[in-house]
C-alpha cells in the first residue's frame, strides 16, 4: 500500500508574508473554505500573536472550517502559545505550531542565546503547548543550516516532550535535493525516537528548488508532510507550490509510490481565488495553473494531441480544474442559474440578502458585457465580500474627461467613513487623475509601489483587474479592483489598498514570523 503524504498549506500564513499580500479576515475565510474543498489536511491560518487582525482571522477560520486541521504559528514561548490556543478554540481539530531557531547564526545573532538555552526553551515550550493541545508541531527554524549533533538533541527532546510533528525547514532556500533528502534521512536515523513523530519539510524557493527539495525530503528522507502554498506564494522567491507537489505525486506515482488526499479538480479554482485576492498574477507558463500550462502551439504537437492526447500531455487540464466550457451565463440568466453556478464554483453565500446583492452586481455587469465567465463571477463575489466588511473607503462613481494634447481631468465620488465625498483632479493620464482625486480627500501620504492591469478574460469586453500596491510606515499592502472600465477598476483598487492601510488590526508584529 502507498504511503500517504500530509499536505500542510500555509498560504494564509507564510504566503501572506509576500510584500503586499496581506489579507483581511473575510478574505482568509474565503481562501480557507476553498482549501477545505481542496481537501488540504492542515490549514495554517496565521500567527495569532503577530496582530489582533491575525488573531481574529484565525478564530474565524477555526469556526468556518469543519474537516481540515486548523493551525496557528507561535514562537516557542508561553505567551505566543497561549495566544495560538485561544485563537483556535472553535476548531474541530487544531494544531499549535511552535518554532525556534537552531542554526548557529540565528542563535548567536537573532536570539542571542547559547545552544543549551535554546534546547531548554524548546523543551519548555513544547511541554507547555501539550497542556493546551494534543497536536503539536515543532519547527527548527533554519534547520537545514543547523549543526547535525545539536539538531538531533533538540528534536529528540521535543519529541519526548510531546511534539507529534517535526518540521525541518530550509528557511533561506539554500538546500539542493539530494543533500536535503540525505539531511532528513540522517536526522531520522540518528534520532532514537524519530518513529514517534511525523517528519515534515518546509522549503523556500530562493534557488528555484523548493518543490524538488520537498519531494526529495519525502522520497529520500522519509518525511511524510509537505508544507506548501497555493501558487508558491511566499516572501522573497516564494514557497513550495502545492499544485506542483500534488501533481508530481499523482503523475509520477510509479516513482514516488505515495498518495495524498487532495481533490485535484479544485486546484485551479484555488489558484484563481488566491491570485484575485492577493493581486499576485500567476505567470502564464507556471506549471499546472498557468494559462499556458496546457497550451500547444507547435503544429507537430497539435497534430499529435489530436491523434492521441498522451503524445504530449502527461496530465489532463480538466483533472486540475481547467474548464473547457468557459461561457457560463449571460444577460438573460436568472437568479437560480446564478446561484447554481456559485455552488458549482464552490462559493458559499449564506444570507439571502448577500445573494440578492451579488445577483444585482451580476445583472449590472451583464448589461455591460454579453458573456459572463467564471472569472467574472469570482470578481463579483470578491467585490461583494469587500462591501460586506464595512470598508472605510467605498467607491461610488467617477467621471473623467480627456482630450489629445490636454491634461485629463477626473471626478471621483466615494464614501469615506459615513460621509459621501467627491473630488476633482488632473493627472498625466485618466488613471493618474482619478487616483490624484482620491488622494486629494484621503490624504494618505502612501507611496505607490506598483500599478498593474490584467484582463480577467479574453476580448475587449473583458473586465480589467487592477492591482495597486501602497507602502506607508513600513507596511506594504495590495488593493485589487475589477470593472469593465479600467479607470473605475483603478479607483476601486486604490481604495481597496487604502482600506487595508486604514485597518489597524492588520499591522503585524515586527518579528521573524517564518520557519
UniProtKB/Swiss-Prot annotation:
Record keyword Cell inner membrane present: no
Family: Belongs to the alpha-IPM synthase/homocitrate synthase family. LeuA type 1 subfamily.
UniProt GO BP: L-leucine biosynthetic process
Swiss-Prot/TrEMBL cofactor(s): Mn(2+)
A single GO cellular-component term on record: cytosol
PANTHER family: 2-ISOPROPYLMALATE SYNTHASE 1, CHLOROPLASTIC-RELATED, HOMOCITRATE SYNTHASE-RELATED
Organism, as annotated: Polynucleobacter asymbioticus (strain DSM 18221 / CIP 109841 / QLW-P1DMWA-1)
Alphabetized GO MF terms: 2-isopropylmalate synthase activity; acetyl-CoA C-acetyltransferase activity; manganese ion binding
UniProt protein name: 2-isopropylmalate synthase
Source organism, top-level taxon: Bacteria
Amino acid at each position: 500500500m502507498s504511503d500517504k503524504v500530509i499536505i500542510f498549506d500555509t498560504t494564509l500564513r507564510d504566503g501572506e508574508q509576500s510584500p503586499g499580500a496581506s489579507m483581511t479576515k473575510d478574505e482568509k475565510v474565503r481562501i480557507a473554505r476553498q482549501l477545505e474543498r481542496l481537501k488540504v489536511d492542515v490549514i495554517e491560518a496565521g500567527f495569532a500573536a503577530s496582530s489582533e487582525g491575525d488573531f481574529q482571522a484565525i478564530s474565524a477560520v477555526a469556526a468556518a472550517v469543519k474537516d481540515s486541521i486548523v493551525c496557528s504559528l507561535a514562537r516557542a514561548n508561553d505567551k505566543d502559545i497561549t495566544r495560538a490556543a485561544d485563537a483556535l478554540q472553535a476548531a474541530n481539530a487544531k494544531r499549535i505550531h511552535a518554532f525556534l531557531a537552531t542554526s548557529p547564526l540565528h542563535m548567536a545573532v537573532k536570539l542571542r542565546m547559547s545552544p543549551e538555552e535554546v534546547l531548554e526553551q524548546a523543551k519548555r515550550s513544547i511541554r507547555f503547548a501539550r497542556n493546551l493541545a494534543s497536536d503539536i508541531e515543532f519547527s527548527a527554524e533554519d534547520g537545514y543550516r543547523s549543526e547535525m549533533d545539536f539538531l538531533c538533541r533538540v528534536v529528540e527532546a521535543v519529541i519526548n516532550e510531546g511534539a507529534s510533528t517535526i518540521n525541518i525547514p530550509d528557511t533561506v532556500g539554500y538546500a539542493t535535493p539530494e543533500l536535503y533528502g540525505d539531511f532528513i534521512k540522517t536526522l531520522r536515523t540518528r534520532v532514537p525516537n524519530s518513529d514517534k513523530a511525523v517528519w515534515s519539510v518546509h522549503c523556500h524557493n530562493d534557488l528555484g528548488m523548493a518543490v524538488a527539495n520537498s519531494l526529495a525530503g519525502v522520497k529520500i528522507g522519509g518525511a511524510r508532510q509537505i508544507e506548501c502554498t497555493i501558487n508558491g506564494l511566499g516572501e522573497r522567491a516564494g514557497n513550495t507550490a502545492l499544485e506542483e507537489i500534488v501533481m508530481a505525486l499523482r503523475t509520477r506515482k510509479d516513482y514516488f509510490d505515495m498518495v495524498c488526499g487532495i481533490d485535484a479538480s479544485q486546484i485551479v479554482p484555488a489558484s484563481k481565488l488566491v491570485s484575485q485576492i492577493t493581486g499576485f498574477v500567476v505567470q502564464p507558463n507556471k506549471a499546472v495553473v498557468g494559462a499556458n500550462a496546457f497550451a500547444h502551439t507547435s503544429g507537430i504537437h497539435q497534430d499529435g494531441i489530436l491523434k492521441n492526447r498522451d503524445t504530449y500531455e502527461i496530465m489532463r487540464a480538466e483533472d486540475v480544474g481547467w474548464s473547457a466550457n468557459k461561457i457560463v451565463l449571460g444577460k438573460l440568466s436568472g437568479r437560480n442559474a446564478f446561484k447554481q453556478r456559485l455552488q458549482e464554483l464552490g462559493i458559499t453565500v449564506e444570507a439571502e440578502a448577500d445573494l440578492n446583492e451579488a445577483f444585482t452586481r451580476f445583472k449590472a455587469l451583464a448589461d455591460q458585457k454579453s458573456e459572463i465567465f467564471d472569472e467574472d463571477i469570482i470578481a463579483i463575489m470578491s467585490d461583494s465580500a469587500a462591501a460586506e466588511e464595512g470598508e472605510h473607503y467605498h467607491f461610488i462613481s467617477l467621471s473623467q474627461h480627456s482630450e489629445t494634447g490636454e491634461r485629463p481631468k477626473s471626478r471621483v465620488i466615494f464614501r469615506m467613513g459615513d460621509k459621501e465625498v467627491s473630488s476633482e483632479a488632473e493627472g498625466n493620464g485618466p488613471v493618474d487623475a482619478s487616483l490624484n482625486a482620491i488622494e486629494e480627500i484621503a490624504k494618505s501620504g502612501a507611496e505607490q509601489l506598483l500599478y498593474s492591469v490584467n484582463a480577467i478574460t479574453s476580448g475587449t469586453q473583458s473586465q480589467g483587474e487592477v492591482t495597486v500596491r501602497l507602502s506607508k510606515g513600513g507596511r506594504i499592502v495590495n488593493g485589487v479592483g475589477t470593472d469593465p472600465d479600467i479607470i473605475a477598476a483603478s479607483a476601486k483598487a486604490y481604495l481597496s489598498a487604502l482600506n487595508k492601510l486604514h485597518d489597524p488590526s492588520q499591522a503585524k508584529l515586527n518579528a521573524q514570523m517564518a520557519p
